[in-house]
């Protein structure tokens, strides 16, 4: 009985090893490096539509419209009526969650270069990894990170006339931007901004995450709400024309900035309206 058990165990181990070697070999062939580079005339493109699976997506300023990709996915790039559609396609699915293949070492990287011109539309969605958008000038932008995966989104030195952002588990950071008419909503991730001007906008976090606004432009005016997190804001210089409407339900509001007298500076044309349920509101 013991010999039979040992023989069966040996057969099982040998079969498992052979199957693993064959599987990894197949996956290695299936996960070869794919590179692509395409350029487009600057006067032919007025909009961008980017759909990524799990690449590090980088949008940056340059002399000419171009798309560069390195990774394991297939990339589909098409110009349709002045809009450049960039889609990272899934090659195969891992239905069993066996994501331990040692050959999967390539890090996908998608770079989109945009010349110094104002776009009409910018659409971006991704499932995981990181997104960095730099020096983008656009009339309307829609950034959708509504998937379960985490995508760290950065919008830097950009000018957006109208912004729509949705991030389920994806934090967004605005750095040195000029943003107007924004609708920014995060279900389970922070909203951060630094040295930015935000006007006529709404910032909303629906769970216990915070809204951090550091060294903001003194002409910022918007509404912000965090269900159970805190809202913390500071200015880049002494405010001159601001009215605070701070509404914490169970939390506290604290104004440490000495420029304010009864939550007001000057005429109060730039209104900051903030709400929390259990979190605190702090103006530094």
Give the location of each predicted region:
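Hydrophobic membrane-insertion alpha-helices, especially the h-region
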Residues: 6-23
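A charged, solvent-exposed segment within the mature domains of Sec-exported extracytoplasmic proteins
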Residues: 132-187
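Short, surface-exposed interaction patches in beta-rich subdomains
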Residues: 162-163, 172-284
